[in-house]
Amino acid sequence: MTLTSIGPANRMARSAETHPLTWRLREDAQPVWLEEYQSKDGYAAARKALTQMAQDDIVQTVKDSGLKGRGGAGFPTGVKWGLMPKDESLNIRYLLCNADEMEPNTWKDRMLMEQLPHLLVEGMLISARALKAYRGYIFLRGEYVDAARNLNRAIDEAKAAGLLGKNILGSGFDFELFVHTGAGRYICGEETALINSLEGRRANPRSKPPFPAAVGVWGKPTCVNNVETLCNVPAIVGNGVDWYKTLARPGSEDMGTKLMGFSGKVKNPGLWELPFGVSARELFEDYAGGMRDGFQLKAWQPGGAGTGFLLPEHLDAQMFAGGIAKVGTRMGTGLAMAVDDSINMVSLLRNMEEFFARESCGWCTPCRDGLPWSVKLLRALERGEGQPGDLETLEQLVNFLGPGKTFCAHAPGAVEPLGSALKYFRAEFEAGISRQPSAAPRPATVGA
């Protein structure tokens, strides 16, 4: 699996003007350490932010750029930063980097942290300056051992060079940065569950309001941003808003570039930095190379396991939030998965729902009970032992676990692929209905 934007399918020469995230990558995929990073304008944006810009000007620059969160939700970053309190007496503030990348079929943040650790450090330094945060934590997926090692080395290098710690670059600004490895729970991708875990608590989502900007880690104002989001900040501050807005393709409502990828039985699975608005067909055919010989594209997901399935006819959709919404799902992380014609959708959904059921924190009843119920029904259908009404029950579960009906977005993301699979591949589910009726009574509705 290609973990960089380098590859035979990438015909674009990477430069600072067109590939702000990946232009510094080495051809051998080794980490870019401080000396090399600084030789490629590394920390120039941080110097500008700390010595030439007011803190509020940094926030306004990011807001004007149109940068949105790259973790899947797509909330405007500058708006989120603007929620931090203006009261100067609240001088203990935290910046958290959500690096708990556990979405199946997603590995974009891993590449950035392993190969460009100083880009994340610089992005967090600038962001902390804007937010008046004196301490930052990178909440890292525990399995990312190489990323942890490289980030800790980058932090040590930055400290030794006076780029972290006290009075950074003579600006009077202090910022300490730490790596915290998680314990392996998918729910920690939700920002308040992440905060609870960092505090040493059970990783349950918190009720909002209050939002983390008001009451976050250890009760203090806190901002949580994704790895890729923070890595965009240096280029925006360094090159300006007008430049950043020229990167996306015409028609895209999202600005800048995005790390996108394709996995599955494609000829060239990989990860590429591409402008928002590129068509999914271009990503699939020109970059991923289409399907391997002997396989046909049956369906695809645009951005992780928590997004809905689409058909080959939907490949002309533009890869940005609004473009994917037009064909019925979310862009998510932007790393697509191809489902080939050898895959049974019932088996695939059973596998996916087992994952989501296992990763539920169990805090709210619909998610705690509904997801295992869906797994039970899918297992029966997979064995050919489904009963009449099972598909209708699954559809009710999709409805009852949908947006706004559970404590957080875990359950809605879990049932989105299930709902789309029932819509597009219903015959495969119907094939799992047994011709012999069960003697056991079956509930008529989900709520019974």
Curated annotation (Swiss-Prot):
One of its GO terms (biological process) is cellular respiration. SUPFAM superfamilies: Nqo1 FMN-binding domain-like, Nqo1 middle domain-like, Nqo1C-terminal domain-like. It comes from Pseudomonas aeruginosa (strain ATCC 15692 / DSM 22644 / CIP 104116 / JCM 14847 / LMG 12228 / 1C / PRS 101 / PAO1). Composed of 13 different subunits. Subunits NuoCD, E, F, and G constitute the peripheral sector of the complex. NDH-1 shuttles electrons from NADH, via FMN and iron-sulfur (Fe-S) centers, to quinones in the respiratory chain. The immediate electron acceptor for the enzyme in this species is believed to be ubiquinone. Couples the redox reaction to proton translocation (for every two electrons transferred, four hydrogen ions are translocated across the cytoplasmic membrane), and thus conserves the redox energy in a proton gradient. [4Fe-4S] cluster binds at residues 361, 364, 367, 408. InterPro entries: NADH-UbQ_OxRdtase_51kDa_CS (IPR001949), NADH-UbQ_OxRdtase_suF (IPR011537), Nuo51_FMN-bd (IPR011538), Nuo51_FMN-bd_sf (IPR037225), Nuop51_4Fe4S-bd (IPR019575), Nuop51_4Fe4S-bd_sf (IPR037207). The keyword Heme does not apply. Its EC number is 7.1.1.-. NAD(+) binds at residues 69-78. PANTHER family: NADH-QUINONE OXIDOREDUCTASE SUBUNIT F. FMN binds at residues 182-229. Binds 1 FMN. It is an enzyme of class 7 (translocase). GO terms for molecular function: 4 iron, 4 sulfur cluster binding; FMN binding; metal ion binding; NAD binding; NADH dehydrogenase (ubiquinone) activity; quinone binding. It catalyses: a quinone + NADH + 5 H(+)(in) = a quinol + NAD(+) + 4 H(+)(out). Gene3D superfamilies: 3.10.20.600, 6.10.250.1450, NADH-ubiquinone oxidoreductase 51kDa subunit (3.40.50.11540), NADH-ubiquinone oxidoreductase 51kDa subunit, iron-sulphur binding domain (1.20.1440.230). Belongs to the complex I 51 kDa subunit family. This is NADH-quinone oxidoreductase subunit F. Keywords: 4Fe-4S, Flavoprotein, FMN, Iron, Iron-sulfur, Metal-binding, NAD, Quinone, Translocase, Ubiquinone. Its cofactor is FMN; [4Fe-4S] cluster. GO terms for cellular component: respiratory chain complex I.
